[in-house]
From Swiss-Prot:
The lineage of its organism: Bacteria, Pseudomonadati, Pseudomonadota, Gammaproteobacteria, Vibrionales. It comes from Vibrio vulnificus (strain YJ016). Gene3D superfamilies: lpxc deacetylase, domain 1, lpxc deacetylase, domain 2. It catalyses: a UDP-3-O-[(3R)-3-hydroxyacyl]-N-acetyl-alpha-D-glucosamine + H2O = a UDP-3-O-[(3R)-3-hydroxyacyl]-alpha-D-glucosamine + acetate. It comes from the Bacteria. Belongs to the LpxC family. Its cofactor is Zn(2+). This is UDP-3-O-acyl-N-acetylglucosamine deacetylase. GO terms for cellular component: membrane. Keywords: Hydrolase, Lipid A biosynthesis, Lipid biosynthesis, Lipid metabolism, Metal-binding, Zinc. Catalyzes the hydrolysis of UDP-3-O-myristoyl-N-acetylglucosamine to form UDP-3-O-myristoylglucosamine and acetate, the committed step in lipid A biosynthesis. One of its GO terms (biological process) is lipid A biosynthetic process. The active site is at H265 (proton donor).
Length: 305
């Protein structure tokens, strides 16, 4: 059968919080089968847990943030969550000593490296997939996102930015998910923003950790980062990365096709909630044989460049 996965070892790293600008220590711990994905703030006494759940996403203004009933939050979870989805991790404890996950380089790549460093272990429990059974669509003005049945996990994402530095031919991406494809084609895409917005937000004591080290920064005419883009379609690729992380807030791999136009964290989350609220729209499924799975996860011991 296709089994659940966790980490072999505990791993730790430090980085900067995007919003606070302060040092954050991140620790990833193995967890027992059927634990799920648990985010934990260890700077509070007692520690506060945030199980991955689309209902826990209560703020999507500048990132994806989990907020509990007491108003305690943990922000900027989407890039790490995307790495967990990409590597097929089902069970993990994620500890931070701050109200946010460190931003690292603004992509999911450092988290992929961290997971590979920890090693991946299969567990004696079946991996549970969510299979989309019928179309579900969520709209907000001219923006929309939808799931339709598909025997695999496919992303069809289109953005619309009228900017000289964003090629009009590079604003749509079709991605058929596999671990190898995620690591090589998606994980390195960085978040992006406009200098005028960053300057305003920093004047409001927000995104104090934002810099050229962890984002693609644009003015009205060009990309300001000296090194430019990592690949030509990095903008839409990062939106796909964000969506993979947002959709994995259900804690399970999805079998279906996600289509979106100008979607963001909020719309991604609303679609996921709408799907899960409609019991006729999805079903649980497991696979007795690896070859039967329509979603291609790499072997646990495979090292991916």
């Amino acid at each position: 059968m296709i089994r659940q996965r966790t980490l072999k070892e505990i791993v730790k790293t430090t980085g900067v919080g995007l919003h606070s600008g302060r040092k954050v220590t991140l620790t990833l711990r193995p967890a027992a089968a059927n634990t799920g994905i648990i985010y934990r703030r260890t700077d509070l006494t007692p520690a506060v847990d945030f199980p991955a759940d689309p209902a826990s996403v209560r703020d999507t203004m500048l990132c994806t943030a989990l907020v509990n009933d007491e108003g305690v939050r943990i922000s900027t979870v989407e890039h790490l969550n995307a790495a967990l989805a990409g590597m097929g991790i089902d069970n993990i404890i994620i500890e931070v000593d701050a109200p946010e996950i460190p931003i690292m380089d603004g992509s999911a790549s450092p988290f992929v490296y961290l997971l590979q460093q920890a090693g991946i272990e299969t567990q004696n429990a079946a991996k549970r997939f969510i299979r989309i059974k019928k179309p579900v669509r969520f709209e907000d003005g001219d923006k929309w996102a939808e799931f339709v049945p598909f025997n695999g996990f496919r992303m069809d994402f289109e953005i619309e930015f009228n900017h000289p530095a964003i090629d009009s031919d590079e604003q749509r991406l079709l991605f058929d998910f596999s671990t190898q494809g995620f690591v090589r084609e998606i994980s390195r895409a960085r978040t992006f923003g406009f200098m005028r917005d960053i300057e305003y937000l920093q004047s409001q004591n927000l995104v104090l950790g934002g810099s050229f080290d962890n984002a693609i920064v644009l003015d009205d005419y060009r990309i300001l980062n000296e090194e430019g883009l990592r690949f030509e379609n990095e903008f839409v690729t990062h939106k796909v990365l964000d969506a993979i992380g947002d959709l994995y807030m259900c804690g399970h791999a999805i079998i279906g096709e996600f289509r979106a136009y100008k979607s963001g964290h909020g719309l991604n989350n609303q679609l996921l909630r709408a799907v899960l609220a409609d019991q006729e729209a999805w079903e649980w499924t497991t696979f007795e044989e690896e070859v039967g799975s329509p979603v291609a996860f790499a072997e646990p011991n495979m090292v991916l460049a």
